[in-house]
A protein has these predicted regions:
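Short N-terminal targeting/anchoring amphipathic segment
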Residues: 89-105, 111, 121
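Acidic anion/phosphate-binding donor-loop and adjacent secondary structure
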Residues: 195, 209-226
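Conserved donor-binding/catalytic core segment of Leloir-type glycosyltransferases
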Residues: 4, 220-236
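N-terminal subdomain of nucleotide-sugar transferases
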Residues: 1-54, 60-64
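Active-site proximal beta-strand in glycosyltransferases
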Residues: 2-6, 97, 115-155, 184, ...
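Membrane-proximal helix-turn-helix segments that form the acceptor-binding/catalytic region
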Residues: 144-183, 191-192, 196
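A short, charged, and often flexible helix/loop element on the N-terminal side
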Residues: 61-87, 100, 153-165
Length: 236
């Protein structure tokens, strides 16, 4: 069976081939790919990601095949040029299943618009179309403006602007969910919000894998750093 993943990160071995620094996020996805291959010898896995290049690049010298799509003008706005690349990938790899990881990026929508959706599934990693309305945490806009920094002004990236960007990505997300026929999620929250957008979609429950460290280490009181609160990394 041939499975094509659409990912928001470039996996470490592809980064090494491109002489790029591997990402510090999304390690669970790479761990999941390795576990999937180890438990399914008949599986051919390919991963499509955006990269800062100018042409479609194919890497075939690893157990996972990589398709690197030109980022062109970033990943925040929909770019119709992505459609031709996804079509080329589908024709070249001929996947039996297309698995899109994450619903919030416009290139996921490009894949859904272009490729066969009959055997396509999207994994929900959160829903920006819902998060956007809570992005400011109930803090009044005028109070946020008072706390603007030099960085916010120079980069034109204040919290209200970030919220606006999330609303836009949320619209891409809603379009995607109305196209696909299958969605993977983990919680009742996922399921309820997916069905609110697309009532006829088939919802599948599936927990995600974790990074290998979580499976090889065990918490013990006598070795822990006491009186410390551990927080996971946060992107937003």
């Amino acid at each position: 069976m041939k499975v094509l993943w659409v990912s928001n990160i470039i996996f470490p071995e592809a980064c090494n081939d491109l002489r790029m620094t591997p990402p510090v996020v999304g390690g669970w996805m790479h761990a999941g790919a390795i576990a999937l291959l180890e438990s399914n010898s008949h599986l051919d896995l390919a991963v499509a990601s955006l990269y800062p290049g100018t042409e479609l690049k194919i890497i075939t010298n690893h157990k996972i095949q990589y398709y690197l799509i030109p980022q062109i003008k970033g990943n925040q706005y929909y770019n119709k040029e992505w459609e031709q690349f996804f079509k080329q990938i589908e024709e070249h790899f001929k996947p039996d299943i297309i698995h899109i990881h994450g619903s919030e990026y416009p290139y996921s929508l490009a894949c859904a618009k272009t490729c066969n959706t009959k055997n396509m599934v999207v994994s929900i990693q959160g829903m920006v179309s819902v998060y956007a309305q809570y992005y400011l945490g109930g803090i009044p806009i005028k109070e946020i403006h008072k706390a603007r920094t030099f960085r916010d002004i120079i980069r034109k990236d204040s919290l209200p602007i970030q919220q606006h960007k999330m609303y836009r990505r949320g619209e891409y997300e809603r379009q995607l969910l109305r196209i696909v026929k299958h969605v993977i999620g983990r919680t009742r929250w996922d399921r309820s919000n997916v069905w609110a957008v697309s009532p006829n979609v088939t919802y599948h429950f599936c927990n995600e894998t974790l990074r290998p460290t979580f499976y090889h280490k065990k918490w013990e009181y006598h070795t822990c750093q006491k009186h410390t609160i551990f927080l996971s990394q946060a992107h937003y």
